[in-house]
Design a protein with these regions (language model features):
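N-terminal small-residue-enriched
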Residues: 1-459
Length: 459
């Protein structure tokens, strides 16, 4: 990518200017996407990106810059400019760089470069045809394939030198159905950390059926009457609520700024004993997994909440230093254009022992939120608002009619203790998460669970 001699000179220059830590992040990536809309390939895109990010730490203060120009003189100048912003300390020398091996647990079986564009187009057409076969009220189908190959090199003044390759593959399918009272959209978006084999093994019929039937059911649905009520939250992407409303406030990026309701709560009970939550970056082939984080640390499994007790935060180098905890291998960034901060990887509520039937039977009137859509959250307060993509009324302990227009509104810190029943049907779902270090692949997940009371927005 760039010469090791150049990297060493950058590290030396940063420390000579008084920084106590200098880091170099080099990235070379390429991505492509194929998009089918209304039975036609309407967009094919590809891009390449190369650049270098340089970070200097002066105590707890970080200064970051980047360049797409690998010229040595340019990078030395950039390092010097960054150093001018810091509070200079004594000059030191970096440790000698020693290349470290990376254990790759994410095998790529089919190199995307060996696959023809025609094969990709044919797969998208199969998704379109399969989705439309589930009903004439399907008005529109959008199918998209995303592939990305990312190579990174990370070096720092403590002697670290490590390289890693990351291949991503994701399918996004949306179906729009309409039966009179406005269109309804449903989507499925599986993805992996892996190669083109993901697309050759994908279950076209299942994914198409799930999206089409969800859209068709909601097209027939009436509106729910809002209010505070018990909710059974479906597995898989239902975990987006924990991710957004509780996961972000557990990142040291929020904790160190005293911008989280979980500040100072380690060792305290924050949920009922049935709940254990985990962030695990080591699950093979999972969309949010990593061999190493974007500071070069091996990925880890971190128990966030165990039997209702808050056990850990998610930390990067700066966060771990300020919060006085070990690093959890959670430093992430979208690209070389962003400094790394603590971020989630594969974050999920673990399996419990309750059954779906028992959850439904325990409710006289409530909502079964089978599939969640998008929403928003304030990490400082944990306040969230999420749309329900597919929902059903619960009446007298049974699932009743489909309902549309429902939203779940609350505060993560307050909702956690109201989770009283957790099933044993854990599923994980791929997503993209945006924060101060850009958009990164993350996985959310949970078993089906019951929230005793939450505000449901409706009509």
């Amino acid at each position: 990518m760039i010469k090791h001699e150049t990297i060493t000179k950058i590290l030396e220059h940063g420390l000579s200017k008084g920084a106590d830590f200098t880091e170099v992040f080099v990235e070379d990536s390429k991505s492509s996407s194929f998009n089918l809309l209304d039975r036609k390939i309407d967009q094919i895109q590809s891009s390449n990106s190369f650049g270098i990010g340089i970070r200097l730490l002066f105590g707890d203060e970080a200064y970051y810059g980047y360049s797409s120009d690998p010229n040595e003189a340019n990078l030395i100048k950039l390092t010097g400019n960054l150093a001018e912003s810091g509070k200079s300390g004594p000059s030191t020398d970096p440790e000698t760089l020693e290349k470290q091996s990376v254990q790759d647990i994410h095998h790529v079986a089919v190199n995307p470069a060996t696959v023809s564009d025609q094969e990709r187009v044919e797969l998208l057409r199969k998704f379109d045809e399969s989705t439309r076969s589930h009903g004439g009220d399907i008005q529109q189908v959008n199918a998209n394939m995303l592939e990305k190959q990312r190579s990174v090199l990370i070096a720092n003044s403590e002697g670290l030198l490590v390289e890693d390759s990351r291949d991503y593959a994701r399918m996004r399918l949306s179906a729009i159905a309409e039966k009179g009272d406005g269109p309804q959209t449903a989507a499925e978006s599986p993805g992996v950390l892996g190669g083109y084999e993901f697309f050759r093994e994908i279950d076209v019929e299942k994914i198409s059926k799930d999206a089409a039937q969800s859209a068709l059911r909601m097209a027939d649905a009436g509106y729910i009457e809002g209010g505070v009520m018990p909710v059974v939250l479906g597995n898989g992407f239902g975990g987006v609520i924990f991710h957004e409303a509780c996961g972000h406030p557990l990142e040291t990026e929020a904790i160190r700024k005293n911008a989280s309701p979980f500040c100072g709560k380690l060792g305290e009970k924050v949920a009922q004993p049935v709940l254990t939550a985990i962030d695990d970056g080591t699950i093979a082939q999972r969309w949010g997994s990593l061999n190493i984080d974007d500071e070069g640390m091996p990925s880890k499994r971190t128990v966030l909440i165990e039997n209702g007790v808050l056990k850990s935060y998610l930390s990067d180098r700066i966060g771990a230093r300020q919060v006085e905890m070990e690093r959890t291998g959670s430093a992430r960034r979208e690209s070389y254009k962003f400094a790394p901060v603590s971020r989630m990887r594969n974050t999920f509520i673990d399996n419990g022992n309750d059954t779906f039937d028992d959850m439904i039977a325990s409710i006289d009137f409530g909502l079964y939120a089978k599939k969640m859509g998008g929403g928003s959250v304030n990490p400082a307060t944990g306040e969230f608002n999420f749309a329900v993509q597919e929902g059903y009324a619960i009446r007298n302990g049974k699932i009743a009619e489909p309902v549309r227009g429902a939203t779940l509104i609350g505060k993560g810190f307050e909702v956690l203790p109201r989770i009283s029943m957790i099933g044993n049907d854990l599923e994980l779902a791929a997503g993209m998460c945006g924060a101060s270090s850009g958009w990164v692949p993350t996985t959310v997940g949970q078993p089906t669970l019951k929230i005793d009371s939450i505000l449901v927005g409706g009509r």
